[in-house]
Structures are given as structure tokens and as C-alpha cells.
């Protein structure tokens, strides 16, 4: 009689049954549409949605290649993504450090709720409010500036401020998520190293740079890759607040693809989506590769 | 190099519970002082207050002639070796040791020289390019010590530096730290819960218990003249035998009257029936022929523990036990009845309530 032995592990097959429903959902609603979209990108728009779609090879991609609007949209998307990823990481890291610092005392709960509440607020509701805040004639921001006798803020109406304005709205909405990741990582940082650095004579900045930051690499990796993916796909904020304007300044790739799709140019739209998809895959892989390698001892 | 002075230093987190209570002592320049005591006695807290990693609730700490209460850790010119080493895992051994010097903008040539010297001293020269993850526990400990000595600080603090090492390595490193101290001559404050480490390393030992300083003295005096029951029980392995006894005009009785020590010529200046605790070191309990002026008694052997060089014999005397450190060539077995003796000058008497020496 077996005594003191743990019960035998259930056969591996059982786990497949647990995974199966979710795997099926992912395959049906995630992978399959992607396959279809890629397939559509090689067909003529006019017949794209018909059972016997006409194959056109790389023709849709050739159209994109020579489309100046697409080139601009791509450039804009990359610029915006770069700026937004950087701002998000910096803002989230600073906020996480604030949450950890001793001098916010009992305000900690308030600061935690304040940063995470927007994350669980529906995107569209948040962006509608931001659109109203930025409104030129009756928005809160300009009303306040006006009352103080300061020059008005262009917000989403001016080509020079719209990228910044959209980014602030997106930051407000998403930064809490990144803060949580950083905060969790900060909680795991080795206190001993921090004390050793104090004894070694490090000031606050030196401590952050030489001791904390190297320990935050896991969170930096997760956050920057995730932010990269999210900002390359930027869509909702544009659809709700600017419709790609003013003067195309927020016409990012995914919004442009959506517009083309709306116009029935399915082939080009899906070709564009495929390009974006490949780009996201490539950049994420690069970021992972670069950061994972730099973490090795 | 500097002396360290503690004047009525206390640490409390809520104003009522004291982690450290009114500790006063001074560590003279160049000495190696050990803070020893059981877990939670406040020894590490005290060290961290000296380091500047904990605030001082009451009292003053001075390093050299300067009161450092309000000085942040980085301005105290102290180096510390931590129990878990606290090396920077992403920096090489070289950079771990150089970090403090780099922060002080020491010239590169000077950094290389000092790190090189320390590495030679600690025999870690070949490891300078490695990362801490590629080192053994003992090597990491050396790097941590190296990081402290390259700074040439006024005072070194060691917080249980050997407790993560295995027994053999611990003994080796202990000797090495002692040699290092003799060579550098810098003031060292060393915290440990291991009384053997304390005895072997210290020029002075501070015994702490429940946040209070029990005794601060040289190892020899601490061992020979413990100031109270706690110190008597903590220092020495096996610890001093402590026996509940009653002093009567004619004798000292213990074992609930089952046994009686009759001191020859011990007159009794005390009133009748004074309870006290008698202490005697195991090496002072003699088995065999007793000297003329010794106190003698009968006991049963309860346990025999041969250690090789010597044998520990636990004697049952009435309801109390007495450990005797006997020669290893003595042959006794459990259940034997034998005569033992103690010389009166080896007896320590303590108050049973306060534990203070009589």
C-alpha cells in the first residue's frame, strides 16, 4: 500500500480540456479573422467579399506603396508611437516612484485610485469628455485660461497642438496600467541594495540610476513592448476626438485603413492592416530581443 | 579612523515599545566591538542607527568628535557589510567595489589601485570581471568586504556577515576578518548572534537582551565575571549551569533540599532562607577526587556526550541538572553515581528575580 506519497498527477490530457474552450475562441475570433484579412489583402476590392474573390497578387500593396497619404500616415504613426511610448514609460515610472515614496503618506490610496480609475473607464466615455475639455468655445480648459487672461490652447483644433492633446488624453487613460506593472516591480526590488548604495554614498538620483533602474528591467520590457503595440494600433482616440484631423495630422495607419474599408476599398484596407500587423510583430520582436539580451549577466 | 560613542541611545517605533532602550557605550578608536544577543535583542537596530539607516529616537551617536544623529548615511563616512551581501547584481566585481569611489569622483588610477589592493588582500583578483551571480557565497562575502575596505572609511559595520556561510567557511572567514582588522587597524562594529564569533573576534563585547545593554566588557571579563544571569547563560557553550538554591545560615542548599553543599568555613552573614541562583561553568564542575576546600556532592549521570577532545556529562542532582565538562578519557556511563566538586571561588551568585549578580 503506498503511504506518504502524493496522489498521482492527472494525465496531461486533462489540461488540454481546460485550455480548449479559450483556445477555440482565440482561433475563431482572433486567428481566423487575421488569416481572412491577409487573404483579402491579395484580392481585388470589388470582389473581396464574394465567394470567388479575384486574386490580384501584390497589387494592393503596390497601390499602398505609391500612396502618399499612406506614407504620411505611417510616418505619423511611428512618430506618435515613439513619443507616446517614451512619455508613457516616463510618466508611469515617475508615478510608480511617487506611489512608493514615503512623503505621500496617507494620500497613497487616493493616488492609487486616481491613476487606475481611468483604466477601467470605457475609452469612448473618457475621450468624449476630453473632446469637451479641449473644445474651443465652451471647453473647461480654455474657459479657465480665458478667466486667467492667458492665451487660449489650440487643443485638438490646431495642427500644432493636436498630437500632444491626443497623447495627453491617451496617457490619462492608459498610464495606470503601466504604473501597476512598475509598482509591482518596485515592490520586488532588493532593499539591501538600496541600503548598500546609501552606505556607498549614492544620492537619490544615483540610487535610482545605478540601483533601481537595473532592477526594473522586467517591467520596462513588458511595459515598452505592450505600449509599442498599443500605440501603433491607436484608433479609438482618433475616431472619437479628431476623425484624423485637423488637416490629416492625426490620420494614423489604423484610422486610414478604417476609412478605406468604409469606402469599400477592402483590398487596400486589409493590405494596410497586414503591413501594420507585420510592423508590430517586427518591432515587438526587436524590443524583446534587445532587452532580453541586455538582461543577461 | 574614529571612536564611536553611544549616549543613552533608544529606538522606538510607537513611543511605547522600545527596540533599543538607553544604550550607552563607547568603542575606542581602532577596536573591534561585537554586539551580541539573541534574535530581536536590538543589536541590528543599534548598528543600523549608527549606519544612518534608522533614525535615532532618543540619545546621541557620535563618530569621532562629531554628533551624527542628523547626518544622512552617505555623509557619515562609514562602510557596511550586509548579511546577504547586497551586491549590485548587474555590476561586475570590479564595479561593485569601485562604486563608492566613483560616486566620490575618485581619479580612475586611484580607483584601480585601491580595488587592486583590496582584491589582493582578499584574494579575489581573478574574479574582478565576474558578475556576483557567478560567485560562490564565500566569494560574494569577500567582495562585500572588499567594497567596504576600498572606501577607507572611519568605521566598518558588519551585520551578521557570516551567517549565510557554511560552518567551515564561517570559521575561515572569521579568522580572516580578525587578521584584516589587525592589518587595517580601523574601528569595527560587528553584530552577531553567535557567541563563539563574538568571543573570538572582539576586543570588547556588548551583550544585548530585549533592547537593553546587559554588559559591555572584554571577552575574558564577560566570561569570568558575567554581570547578570542573562550574560552568564548566553556566553559560553555549553552555558553556565544555573541552579536555584537557598542560602541558610549554615549552608547553601539546592535541589529542593535533596542535596546540600556545605561550604567549609563559609560563615553566614545573611538572614535565614535567602533564595538565590548559583552559577558555575561546566569546566569548573570536577568529577573525581575533590580538593580539600571544594564543595562536594553526589550525583547520578543522566547523559554522556563525547565531543572528542572532551566529554560533556550531564549530572542529575536532586531535581536539578548540572553539566560538567570532563576529560575525554574519563569513563562514565548513564546511571552511574559519582562524587563531584566545585571550588567556592568558581561559584557565581545571582538574585533570582532581577538576575543581577549578588
Model-derived regions: residue spans:
Chain B
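Helix-to-loop junction immediately C-terminal to a conserved catalytic motif
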Residues: 51
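ATPase nucleotide-binding modules
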Residues: 227-277, 283-302, 311, 315-332, ...
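Conserved ABC transporter NBD signature motif
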Residues: 59-67
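ABC ATPase nucleotide-binding domains
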Residues: 73-230
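The feature captures the beta-strand-to-loop junction immediately N-terminal to the Walker
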Residues: 36-38
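Conserved coupling/switch loops of ABC nucleotide-binding domains, chiefly the family-specific signature
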Residues: 57-60, 210, 347
Amino acid at each position: 500500500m503506498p503511504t506518504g506519497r502524493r496522489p498521482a498527477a492527472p494525465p496531461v490530457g486533462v489540461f488540454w480540456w481546460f485550455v480548449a474552450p479559450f483556445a477555440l475562441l482565440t482561433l475563431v475570433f482572433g486567428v481566423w479573422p487575421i488569416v481572412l484579412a491577409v487573404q483579402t489583402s491579395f484580392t481585388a476590392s470589388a470582389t473581396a467579399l464574394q465567394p470567388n474573390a479575384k486574386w490580384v497578387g501584390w497589387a494592393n500593396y503596390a497601390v499602398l506603396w505609391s500612396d502618399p497619404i499612406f506614407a504620411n500616415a505611417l510616418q505619423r504613426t511611428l512618430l506618435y508611437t515613439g513619443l507616446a511610448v517614451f512619455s508613457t514609460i516616463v510618466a508611469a515610472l515617475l508615478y510608480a516612484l511617487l506611489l512608493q515614496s514615503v512623503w505621500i503618506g496617507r494620500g497613497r490610496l487616493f493616488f492609487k485610485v486616481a491613476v487606475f480609475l481611468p483604466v477601467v473607464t470605457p475609452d469612448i466615455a473618457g475621450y468624449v469628455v476630453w473632446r469637451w475639455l479641449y473644445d474651443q468655445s465652451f471647453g473647461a480648459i480654455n474657459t479657465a485660461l480665458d478667466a486667467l487672461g492667458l492665451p487660449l490652447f489650440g487643443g485638438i483644433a490646431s495642427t500644432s497642438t493636436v498630437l500632444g492633446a491626443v497623447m495627453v488624453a491617451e496617457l490619462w487613460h492608459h498610464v495606470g496600467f503601466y504604473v501597476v506593472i512598475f509598482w509591482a516591480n518596485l515592490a520586488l526590488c532588493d532593499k539591501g541594495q538600496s541600503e548598500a548604495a546609501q552606505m556607498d554614498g549614492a544620492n537619490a538620483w544615483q540610487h535610482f540610476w545605478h540601483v533601481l533602474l537595473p532592477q526594473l528591467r522586467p517591467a520596462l520590457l513588458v511595459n515598452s513592448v505592450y505600449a509599442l503595440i498599443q500605440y501603433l494600433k491607436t484608433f479609438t482616440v482618433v475616431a472619437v476626438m479628431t476623425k484624423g484631423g485637423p488637416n490629416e495630422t492625426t490620420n494614423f495607419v489604423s484610422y486610414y485603413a478604417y476609412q478605406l474599408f468604409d469606402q469599400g476599398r477592402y483590398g487596400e484596407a486589409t493590405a494596410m492592416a497586414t503591413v501594420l500587423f507585420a510592423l508590430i510583430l517586427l518591432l515587438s520582436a526587436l524590443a524583446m530581443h534587445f532587452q532580453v539580451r541586455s538582461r543577461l549577466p | 579612523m574614529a571612536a564611536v560613542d553611544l549616549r543613552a541611545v533608544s529606538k522606538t517605533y510607537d513611543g511605547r515599545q522600545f527596540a533599543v532602550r538607553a544604550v550607552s557605550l563607547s568603542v575606542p578608536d581602532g577596536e573591534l566591538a561585537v554586539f551580541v544577543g539573541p534574535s530581536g535583542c536590538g543589536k541590528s537596530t543599534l548598528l543600523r542607527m549608527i549606519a544612518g539607516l534608522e533614525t535615532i529616537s532618543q540619545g546621541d551617536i557620535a563618530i569621532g568628535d562629531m554628533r551624527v544623529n542628523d547626518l544622512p548615511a552617505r555623509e557619515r563616512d562609514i562602510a557596511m557589510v550586509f548579511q546577504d551581501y547586497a551586491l549590485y547584481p548587474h555590476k561586475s566585481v570590479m564595479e561593485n567595489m569601485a562604486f563608492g569611489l566613483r560616486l566620490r569622483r575618485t581619479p580612475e588610477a586611484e580607483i584601480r589601485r585601491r580595488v587592486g589592493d583590496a582584491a589582493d588582500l582578499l584574494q579575489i583578483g581573478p574574479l574582478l570581471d565576474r558578475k556576483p551571480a557567478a560567485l560562490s557565497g564565500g566569494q560574494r562575502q569577500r567582495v562585500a568586504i572588499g567594497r567596504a575596505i576600498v572606501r577607507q572609511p572611519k568605521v566598518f559595520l558588519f551585520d551578521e556577515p557570516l551567517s549565510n556561510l557554511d560552518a567551515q567557511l564561517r570559521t575561515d572567514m572569521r579568522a580572516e576578518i580578525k587578521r584584516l582588522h589587525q592589518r587595517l587597524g580601523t574601528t569595527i562594529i560587528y553584530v552577531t548572534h553567535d557567541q563563539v564569533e563574538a568571543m573570538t573576534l572582539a576586543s570588547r563585547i556588548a551583550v544585548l537582551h530585549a533592547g537593553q545593554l546587559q554588559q559591555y566588557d572584554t571577552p575574558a571579563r564577560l566570561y569570568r565575571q558575567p554581570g547578570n544571569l542573562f550574560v552568564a547563560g548566553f556566553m559560553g557553550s555549553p552555558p553556565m549551569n544555573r541552579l536555584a538554591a537557598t542560602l541558610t545560615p549554615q549552608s547553601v542548599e539546592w535541589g529542593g533540599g535533596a542535596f546540600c553543599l556545605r561550604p567549609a568555613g563559609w560563615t553566614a552573614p545573611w538572614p535565614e532562607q535567602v533564595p538565590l541562583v548559583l552559577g558555575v561553568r561546566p569546566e569548573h564542575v570536577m568529577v573525581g577526587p575533590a580538593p580539600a576546600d571544594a564543595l562536594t556532592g553526589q550525583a547520578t549521570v543522566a547523559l554522556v556526550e563525547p565531543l572528542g577532545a572532551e566529554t560533556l556529562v550531564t549530572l542529575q542532582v536532586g531535581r536539578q541538572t548540572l553539566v560538567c565538562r570532563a576529560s575525554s578519557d574519563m569513563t562514565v556511563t548513564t546511571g552511574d553515581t559519582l562524587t563531584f566538586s566545585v571550588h567556592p571561588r568558581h561559584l557565581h551568585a545571582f538574585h533570582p528575580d532581577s538576575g543581577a549578580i549578588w
